[in-house]
């Protein structure tokens, strides 16, 4: 009996140990799973940190001559500065220079762990300039480079444009080797073909030069190809500023687009002319207001050479009407100098009467170089709100001043709240002005 009970006790003890071992095994298995999951979370977190660091690094940087360039990265992400011939000038975990004194572009390559290139960063160093804020309503006459296709329609039940590849927004520049500069030239050239196929050279929206052919259709006494075209555009806006050293100027802060295609108009030439303000249509929620004006019987103030997404650029020839002086010149602020809070806009709402009005800079999108919505602004001046309801069409280009410097220009109004809108940085306007090929543009417009 003693032996039996001893055996029973041993058996129970072994069973308890087995249970304990099984429990320990389960706990170890659970612990390993927890460790594995934590490891995965940590790895994903590290990847997320690296992705965020690379993503938030801007693809392009605009800075003023003499400013400090600081681009810091985390461990494992290196920056290489390349020379004009592609040679590596500097490679480090950060690019820190006391001052960048040379105007031009710096090309930086972002590498991961010294081998995998993940991003390019372009640094454009622009000159520090003084400009004369204008804020005057002016007229603009733009003449297209070629004729702009704005629509298509059947001719006698036929579609000569079908399968030609031409789309709305394209520009026709030649027909049968004859240069096309305006709608009259296109009409005459097509009419002279006698119904024979014509070879058309056109420029697509992405600036690719292409050729195609169409067979005109006779309708009445004329031949037509079923394309609606336009060769000019006109409107009223605000002249932002000019550089007193060379009389180069910018207006609008945004580009002029075609009314039918909503695409930026590629111009061959243009004119800045005087405008006569007729009335102010007050803006309200859901319905933007407008400065109503005319450019009839106007005289030329200057020439337009470039229409870009960031404004209309040209040169001034007659400054008397602007009612400004070179003594009014101010520095263009870098975006780093701009602060949220009070600022002023300068605009003309009555003929010959320019005035400053108080606004608020609500938000600054400091890394935004891709469009003309650099700052969110709000009209706070009660007099301006009483006159216009806020920002209205025709005020685009009104210069914005803060702490004695030009910081930008008005570009957009928020439809649901006309007291709010967007503005573009002044340094972007200077950068765009510097990037215009003035020699080529002037030659093309002559």
Locate the predicted segments by residue.
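Gram-positive cell-envelope targeting signals
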Residues: 1-70, 239, 418-426, 433-446
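Interdomain regulatory linker/hinge segments that flank or connect interaction modules
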Residues: 32-39, 87-131, 309-358
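Conserved PDZ fold ligand-binding element
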Residues: 89, 162-184, 400-403, 407-412
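PDZ domains, with a preference for the canonical peptide-binding region formed by the helix
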Residues: 95-101, 174-203, 417-419, 423-428
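PDZ-domain C-terminal substructure recognizer with occasional recognition of PDZ-binding tails
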Residues: 110-112, 118-126, 187-226
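Serine endopeptidase catalytic core focused on the charge-relay Asp
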Residues: 215-389, 393, 402-403, 411, ...
